[in-house]
Each structure stands twice: as C-alpha cells, then as structure tokens.
C-alpha cells in the first residue's frame, strides 16, 4: 500500500492542515502502516489497530504538545508515535537502540508522561492540569484510559480528586474496547453526543437550574428526572457523581463523531466547563479481520505475515516456566482442595487458562487491581484456604504495602508465583522484574525462592505451598535449560542449596560461585573456564548460611550471581551472612546494575549486563587478577 497522505505527516501540525474529508483516508493508511510495521518487528497489535481514528481525532483537535496527552498503559500508542515524527523509526520498535513500545518522555516532546503500568494516566493528567494553572498557563490535559485500566482503584482515586476542581481543563477519554457496552450508532447518537458536549446544552442546563432555584422541590425533581433520562441514554452516570460532564458512548471509529465532539469538549474545558469525560467504544483489531476475530492472539505477536496471519508455532522442545507453573497449579489443585488461584487480569500470560477450565470455582480474576489481589488472597488464607497469586514480578510492586501489612505482618500462607523475574526483553525497563529479591527479602516472615530449572521450579512451588507463612517463587520469562520434570509433587528442604559443580584439585586460586535462579546455568559456563565451584542456592531467604560458610572456608574468592538488582539483592544477603559470622573473604557481587536496562533481545541484554558466561568469567578474572586462559595457536601450514 502507498502512504500518500501519511508520508506528509511529520508532526500533528501537518495533520491539522488536512481537510476533514481527508482524515478517513489517513486513518486507512495509518492502520495499514501499523499492521505492516508490527508484522515486521513484533509488538502490540490489536490495541493499536483499535485506536487509529481516536489518535487522529485527538491530535487534530487538541494543540499537542502544548495540550498534554497522556496514554494510559501506552501499548496502544503506536499510531501516536507514527503521527509525531517517529514513522521511519517504527522499524526499530522495541529493539536495542530503537524506539520504545510505550510513551517515553526522553523520546519525544509529544510523550508527555512515561507509561507502561496501568491506570496512572488520570493522576498524571490531573497533575499537569493543576501544574499549568499554578504557572498561569492555559492548556488542556487529556488522559486516554482503557476500560480494563478502569478496574484499578488508582483511576478512581484520581477521578475522585479531580472532581473537586469544578473549572479545571481536564479531559478523560475512556477507550472502551471490551464491547461490554454496545455503542449506539447512526445520526441520532452522533447528534446526542454533540448536544451533550456543546455549549447550548451547558447553557440551557445552567439556565434551567437558575430559573428553578427559586423552587427547590421543583429543581430537585427536575434534576432527578434529568439523571433518569440521561441514564437511559448513556451506560453510567457514575462519572457525573465524580464531578465530570459525561458524554457518550460514541463510536470511536467514526471521525465524523469524534472530531466535532472533541472540539466541543476542548472548547468547554478551556472556557471553565470543568472536567470532561468522553466515553468512546472501539474494537480491538479494527480493520484486520484476523485480529478482530482473535484480539488476544494478536495482542502482542512476534513477526508474522499479515496475508497469512499467525501460524501455529511448532511445539517447543522445552516448556516455558509459565507452562511449568500452569501444570503444577492444576496438579496441586487436584491434590489439595484448599488451593485457590488468583490473577490480576493476566490469565493467559500467567499460565492459568487450563486451571480456569478445570477449577472454575477456585479461579479468581480480580482485574487490574494488584493491591486488592494481595489483600483478597490474605482474606482467603484467613479462612483456611491456600491462595496462589500468579503475578508478574513488576506488577507485585503495586501491592507492596498490602504485601507487608495485610499478608506478612499476619504471617498468612499466601504463595506468590512471580513470573517474568529478571529481564524481559522487548518490553524494557517498565516490565523488568529487577527488584523483587531486594524488596521481598527485607520483609519479616517472607520466604523467597529462586529455581534454576524447570523441575526445581515445580519442586520449589510445592515447597512454598506447604509452608505456613508467605512465600514467593520467582522465575524468568521463557524456557529453562531443559531439565526433566518429575510428575510427583515433591518439595525440597527449606533453606538448603545444592552444589552443582565442584572445583578441581589443580593448583591455582579457587573460586566459589553462589548462583541464584536463572544465573546457575551461565555460572556453570563460567566455572568450566575457571574450574570453579557452583552452588545453586535455591533460597534467598532463608539463606543457606551453612553452605555460604563452607564455600568461604574452601575457596579463595566468592562470587554471587543473580538476575536481579545487585543493590539489596541476594549478593547483599550473602555479604550480610559473612559479616554476621565474622568471615572476611573477598566477594564479587554480580547482578543487574544500578540503572534501568533498556529494551532489546534478552540474551543481548544479559550480555550487556555482563551476566552471560563470558561476561561472568571476565568480571571474575578482572576483579581478582586471575590469569587469562592460555590460547594455543596452531602453526600456519605452508
């Protein structure tokens, strides 16, 4: 497809030069470009195909970047990136050195707020609106938030706060793509949306209230009648109770509805009409039939041929850790009726599809509500059940107070299965599970485990489930090393590691590795070159102090390796144990550096952090001044 109009758009100012009649042609080109780009790089697709018209209308009506536009989560911001000067960089999407898959302030002035975690946009936009007022600047702040993100309490906290400011130029756009509310279509709905957003409606409403104010009972009756009538036209008046003027729902793919409605909304906001709430209904995967039919499959695909669609992948030779968890969850649920499974809106990503099918009465999807998920699990535990919370490491950060106050303080037996621990690749720093070891091990009563392979993951999950205290098992994205997985549900001894490789008896300095989780395999690779000992520590807390002391006694140098923040992580736990025992031993701690690691190929990112086998070996030799291995050069043959 040619992109005659799209190629002319290098900034929203170019978009605003187009005739209104050209916008639909631009939308068709933009949607095709999104599909072409994502099919070549991988990335989020369904959500971006669904926001094409909305993105065009927002940049056409609002004076971005002076008017602030905040995308909640941000995985639906590809059309926004394309229209704001990054069209040619889409080929670098989510790659090392390329553009991010989420809004990023350092990437463009049009990315006014960095997002990736859900439900933050209204708070940020409110802060921007009040910041502009404080500075005496007249602009509109717009938050675009999805219906899924509206399940989080933070969004409603922001709405509750925003409603206090009756004349604030704040706009919230609810992008309802779940189709739970079918959009009224046609001329009547378009007319109603324009009417409810226009000055005539506002002036008439205000005038009637002024007239009827002399007769309070009549005014109260009129207000109740208006609320009842409006409640019949729109799906909810809840947002008006928060102090917003609610408009919609309108068709989010109809530019002839979107543009005039947004124009009226912007005008009202700037003229003191107060916070505005626009409800638009869109369809995930819009315009690409395969994605429309299966938006979940096309939510975040890898590279594929758009003409053929996503082909079923060949069955991998090795199971992913997510699959290992899903299998264990079903097996343990069959063995113990007390088990209940909880996910904050990540059924597929966390491997709970089969569990929901087999045990629907013991499966709870609480929505994007991590705080609630943690405390909800605590409540279940109080009744004698054994909750397992399947959650990404990065998202558990959102329920940290609940983790401490509602679970650990009461020593409730909740299992946290932490998927995506460590680096996650293309999603970048916002989704990396870099901090869980550091933020979990400092909590009293908490047990923290780090499996090094598939079978150990199953064993440690069983071990966690058998405890009478809160536990966490962290495992990485993707496949393990290919260990055979036992069918039983055997645990391992609590707080005990195991030596995977013993150093040889040859002369030289002896190095002992204390490796945690995913770093056991690269440590073994480095150990072959160094002839070092490797201990698979398994537990960060309780740490196997006896094994630490033994390695310290038998080796000249110790090296800790973890795929997590080196500050406050497992290496710090080892150093604390040595200090407590009064042992003075040279220790090198290796892990993720004190910076946010960007997006890119996971193996490449580990290499950049020095956490591949070669990088670990190099760090050990440099730190302890060990000789490089001798390389024998074959004689040249004449």
Curated annotation (Swiss-Prot):
Binding site for Mg(2+): 147, 177
GO molecular function: 1-deoxy-D-xylulose-5-phosphate synthase activity; magnesium ion binding; thiamine pyrophosphate binding
Family that this chain belongs to: Belongs to the transketolase family. DXPS subfamily.
Cofactor annotation: Mg(2+); thiamine diphosphate
Residues annotated to bind thiamine diphosphate: 75, 116-118, 148-149, 177, 288, 370
UniProt xrefs under Pfam families: DXP_synthase_N, Transket_pyr, Transketolase_C
Catalytic activity entry: D-glyceraldehyde 3-phosphate + pyruvate + H(+) = 1-deoxy-D-xylulose 5-phosphate + CO2
Function, in words: Catalyzes the acyloin condensation reaction between C atoms 2 and 3 of pyruvate and glyceraldehyde 3-phosphate to yield 1-deoxy-D-xylulose-5-phosphate (DXP).
Cofactor note: Binds 1 Mg(2+) ion per subunit. Binds 1 thiamine pyrophosphate per subunit.
Quaternary structure and interacting proteins, as annotated: Homodimer.
InterPro entries recorded: Dxylulose-5-P_synthase, THDP-binding, Transketo_C/PFOR_II, Transketolase-like_Pyr-bd, Transketolase_BS, Transketolase_C, Transketolase_CS
Keyword Oxidoreductase: no
Gene: dxs
Primary enzyme class: transferase
Record's GO cellular component terms: cytosol
UniProt keyword list: Isoprene biosynthesis, Magnesium, Metal-binding, Thiamine biosynthesis, Thiamine pyrophosphate, Transferase
Organism: Cupriavidus taiwanensis (strain DSM 17343 / BCRC 17206 / CCUG 44338 / CIP 107171 / LMG 19424 / R1) (Ralstonia taiwanensis (strain LMG 19424))
GO BP term (any one): 1-deoxy-D-xylulose 5-phosphate biosynthetic process
Name of protein: 1-deoxy-D-xylulose-5-phosphate synthase
Record EC number: 2.2.1.7
